[in-house]
Amino acid sequence: MSLNQQEMFEKLLEQIEMPTGPEFTEAAIDKLTVHQASKVWEFHLHFQHVLPYTQFMTFQNKLQIAFKEIARVTFTIVTDDTEVNGRELAEYWEWIVQHSGIKSPLVQSLCNSNVPTYEDGRVILLAENEVIQNFLTNQALGPIESTYHRLGFPKFSVHTMIDESASQAKIKEFHEQKAKSDQALAQKAEAAIKKANEKRQKQADAPAPIDGPVQLGKQINPQEPAKQMVQITEEERSVVVEGYVFDMEVRTLRSQRQLLILKVTDYSSSMVVKKFSRNADDEAQFAALKPGMWVRVRGSVQEDSFMRDLTINAYDINETSHASRQDTAPADEKRVELHLHSNMSQMDATNSVSDYVKQAAKWGHPAIAITDHSGAQAFPEAFAAGEKNNIKILYGVEANMVDDGVPIAYNDAHVDLKESTYVIFDTETTGLSAIYDRVIELSAVKMVKGNVVDQFEEFIDPGFHLSETTTNLTSITDDMVRGSKSEEEVFKLFREFYGDAIVVGHNVTFDIGFMNTGYARHHMGPITNPIIDTLTLARWLYPNLRGYRLNTLAKKFNVNLEHHHRAIYDAETTGHLNHLFLKDAEDRYQVQFHDQLNDHMNENAAYRHARPFHATLYAQTQAGLKNLFRIISLSNVEYYYRVPRVPRSVLNKYRDGILVGSACSSGEVFTAMMQKGKEEARQKAGYYDFLEVQPKPAYSALIESGLIADTDHLEEIISNMVELGHEMNIPVAATGDVHYLNPEDKIYRKILIHSQPGNPLNRTERPDVHFRSTDEMLKDFDFLGTETAHEVVVDTPRALADQFEIVRPVKDKLYTPRMKGAEAEIEKLTMDRAHAWYGNPLPEIVQKRVDKELKSIIGNGFSVIYLIAQRLVFKSNKDGYLVGSRGSVGSSIVATLSGITEVNPMPPHYRCPNCQYSHFYTNNEYGSGYDLPPKDCPECGTDMVRDGQNIPFETFLGFYGNKVPDIDLNFSGDYQPIAHNYTKVLFGEKNVYRAGTIGTVADKTGYGYVKAYERDTNQTLRSAEVDRLAKGTTGVKRTTGQHPAGIIVVPDYMDIYDFTPVQYPADDQSAAWQTTHFDFHSIHDNILKIDILGHDDPTMIRMLQDLSGVQPESIPPVDPHVMKIFSSPEVLGVTEDQIFSKTGTLGIPEFGTRFVRGMLEETHPSTFNELLQISGLSHGTDVWLGNAEELIKDGTVTLAEVIGCRDNIMTDLIHYGMESDMSFQIMEHVRKGRGIPDEWQQAMKDANVPDWYIESCLKIKYMFPRAHAAAYILMALRVAYFKVYFPLIYYTAYFSVRADDFDLVAMAHGKDAVKASMKAITDKGMDASAKEKNLLTVLELANEMLERGFKFSMVDLDKSDASDWLIDGDTLIAPFRAVPGLGLNVAKQIVAARADKPFLSKEDLSKRGKVSKSLIDFMTENGVLSDLPDENQLSLF
């Protein structure tokens, strides 16, 4: 089976012996190019984030060493990072300078003498003077920027600034010594070259990678004792430590020596270990070291002034073996873990499911189960890990089960509630177990018609000392019970007291449990009287109360409770509440008799009030998996209350194919056995397919909290569970309730739980719940005897695992939706418009293109995808909102003709709208049809349409047309929710879902958890230990979310549970959409995802249309006046000096940024094709800087001729005469930064492709699709049209749609005030905040508007809109949201209150408009409220 890109990368890590880590999550090899002639292998890698420098150096070194004998290795990294990390920028600096190709030793020296800083979004490099600044700018910055980008850093520019602190004397001295310095530098350069040659020779002579274990320095005597790191508290001359390497870095210093930095832990603490290389042998040893190794280190402990921590300066470092846990059981007697939590158990477990599967396979276990809390989000990873490690995966979940309704009454009897006598009783006990604890006070009141007629109150001597906890909770002391009556005597007296009355209690099942267990102990029968539980009675009658504790209810219903947790007071209070509740039940529900109460036990969302208990549910079959998905979905969507809940009736309904286990100490069987004994447990156990018992340490919290007295009682309970299983013929399996892999990982879970202050798990010490081997598990159950222990640990789990079919949680192919007649409809839409545009019969060039595309689209089942997009676009256009396309959909003429995109991919051509005459240009005469000169039809004289962007279909669906189309559509942000909801109309509400995401603990969050734990536990941890602990908490599920645009479409012949469970994002039950439970990346190859994006451009176009009445489609794509703004602002009636810009493109999409405006200034585009080039160049990587920019500057080619978009490569090469398939392959390689194989380069040369073209291709790392650029440019030109011809309407739309930050006072005061405000921001330089930088962009447009002769007005209480700017003559009236500190909600409130009636005063505005005093003051100071008095005034007439 072929490997995917991620699996290929994992294989690479294995080959170079690089341990995996979170830095390599989802890492992939995008492409590997092998140059056979030059023996160069080019790796193109994709990581989520820029690698930490230590990891990068390790990875690079291991890669070089691994392939040293095969080829020279180069690599390029692409990451998902969008922001520069200043720390990483600085850490990489020396390496970047050394490897950026800077040839001048002087320039290298200047770079090495400084390190850039990253402040407020800018990378700054200080220079002592202008000379150095020019050296850096002209010779260093471009290569440095490109090299950073090659390592995955986001695209950025380095800005040089003069260091004002440099003295004038130093500057003068520099000029005087320039000649001398140049000579010295030349000599230094010569020496450097010589040294570099020597180094290369030295490296060539360097020893091969080491074969044996790492040994740096001398051998350390294995018998020499190692000191625990936690015991190292001060500097020491010599110390030996032994530990696990969890992080490392190798730095190459300016001296060319290497510095090894290890982070090592022995799990008592962690320390940083440093060592400098002495020779090439040391460097080879450095390269052989890797995270995951165990090492012994001897060195001195010193305070590191830079790290401000104790570090070990190593003399010797020896790789050492470490005895990891083994499973020594025979192969056919290995256990199977049936209860295990991965890091997808929200904030409760630490290891990935892959970690567990790998360990289980290493131990030889035949299978392993996954049972995360309430979810299945680890299933896709578990499936992949199972296949990789050849181990059977049992897919399960630990569910929060609830009874659908808890009985209100017990021992139903047809007795009149009004006329009955009630005995309301309460007990005080020594604990919660009716088996192991005792009643120490029994009190009751007898009531008739709400009046107390008798009392019963007795202490009971339990025969043992009361614990401090019991006394604190009940206020009962030893003295109070000592010498009291016995339990048997008091229980007999109480039976006489209650007689035939109705027995009542609050949470009465607890008290009845103690009473009936006591009666059984004394050979008396249980209570058979009718019973009422006021707790469930209150929950039924009053389902929306926040709490149902006795004291809470007493306060709510004004019933006096003198001393809560004393039995007599609790009993009397319960009696009065019972009287009130039964009267209410009669009035509201006509309940008259005791046996009517339980008719209502399932009402008012009773599942919300039932106490959840745990059960483990496993999918034994594929049908069972679907049922499990359904159950998980229902628990998250319909029965969510604080946690996802599974009503017993839901499990009963969908139990087919599901195995049910009794779970952990929170399961109902174990709880019953612990609290009420074997007979109660027997009643519960019959529901389960197997019973679970767990190692004694897993129950430690029960002993600590007093629920179980001691270990002896715990062993008795576990033994009783096993006996019960034997008696009922129910299998009993020993399970681990695993939450982490190894014992030392316990601390990570502890930190996670500590980060949740309200988590009840914080009340006790966390138990030992690591993944246990067969040996460890047998030892934990040895108290059962050898035979029984083997049965529950080995035999039963293996037998259960054998009952499972091989289940697949992820499909193996794509399932697209069906729409009846989609193929015929797409074909008809295409052909109808084709004939309307080009006539019938079609021109051969059109017919061939249409036939080719329809064959691919229909033949591969893609018609429905096209039709979905067509329906969405059609509806949006019909509703008045244009849709912009993203990606390569504009490469398809079928998409164009069916109305999905406005981009026409045919070669440039004329077509007559009247007689359908057409003429195509197929020899690259024009880059874009929009650039054709106006021309009348030679047949009928009609002005012809000019169209065609010359884009090959292959860029969309691949060379063979079988690639699944990815149609991304840009809808107006205002219209996006409507477009999303329209998919429900198209497919039905049960067939569309938002694409789900999973939010996990990130590095910084984990660091914060550790620091909080350190603070709250009064510890002082070394920085290395903080790093280790933070690493252990990362990747754990925190929450869930949804993709902002992705809609998942389920085909009508399947349902969502065939693919994934569903839920609400972040468990928000008020959310409008349900999401996939699986992260959408897990199922993206199995089910269709449509990206319906929200974008400002369509919103702005709609507003421009509404204000002007001009239909956007009627705007010519290329207007001569509009095109002038790309070269000069003069067409706007302003000069460069007035608006501080050499172009008129401020505020124009795609062309308004400083970077792109700089490109415009250099290239002066005048055609649509050249604008396409600019768009492609600005979005690509290594396409403009150091590439096309230089080709244009030195006159090699023009803007129109450089490679701008990916599609140009294929069409250009075909034009040169190359075969279309090779042209396509070269385009694909180049656009992804994979280079060009030598044989293809030769083919290009044979076709007379210029050298500059080939060299340009080789530099490119990423290229923009031409169709995407064309759609963006078309939208931008429409916006620009309004800026030129309808200026005030344009500015209204811009400030309403695109601007969020305003300086309203400056704008209202005119251009001088605006310019002053702009200067105040620019003067701050790097110190300007992000908000100020955003404001500067808005002020640039405000200044331009003012310079064009228009004005701004302060908000107008009577006219202003809440959010949009309004036109009033030549003035724009500000909306209320433009007032500093006035949010949109308040703005809407002001407008709503104004519509109701005019404001009478400032007081009235404050009250009805919800306007704060500070906002009132602002408006008053700026003349907005000049006509309003301060307060309302009464009129006498």
From Swiss-Prot:
Q: What does this protein do?
A: Required for replicative DNA synthesis. This DNA polymerase also exhibits 3' to 5' exonuclease activity.
Q: List the catalysed reactions.
A: DNA(n) + a 2'-deoxyribonucleoside 5'-triphosphate = DNA(n+1) + diphosphate
What does the sequence similarity comment in the record state about its family? Answer: Belongs to the DNA polymerase type-C family. PolC subfamily.
Q: Where in the cell is it found?
A: Cytoplasm
Protein name according to UniProt = DNA polymerase III PolC-type
Which residue ranges are recorded for the region named Disordered? 196-219
Taking every annotated instance into account, which residue ranges of this chain make up the domain Exonuclease? 422-578
Recorded GO CC terms: cytoplasm
| SMART domains with a match to the protein in the record | EXOIII, POLIIIAc
Q: Which UniProt keywords apply?
A: Cytoplasm, DNA replication, DNA-directed DNA polymerase, Exonuclease, Hydrolase, Nuclease, Nucleotidyltransferase, Transferase
The principal location of this protein is cytoplasm
Primary enzyme class = transferase
Q: Which GO terms describe its molecular function?
A: 3'-5' exonuclease activity; DNA binding; DNA-directed DNA polymerase activity
Entry's EC annotation: 2.7.7.7
Which CDD domains does this chain map to? DEDDh (cd06127), PHP_PolIIIA_POLC (cd07435), polC_OBF (cd04484)
Report TM segments: none
Instruction: Provide the GO biological process annotations.
Output: DNA-templated DNA replication
Which one Pfam family would you cite for this protein? DNA_pol3_a_NI
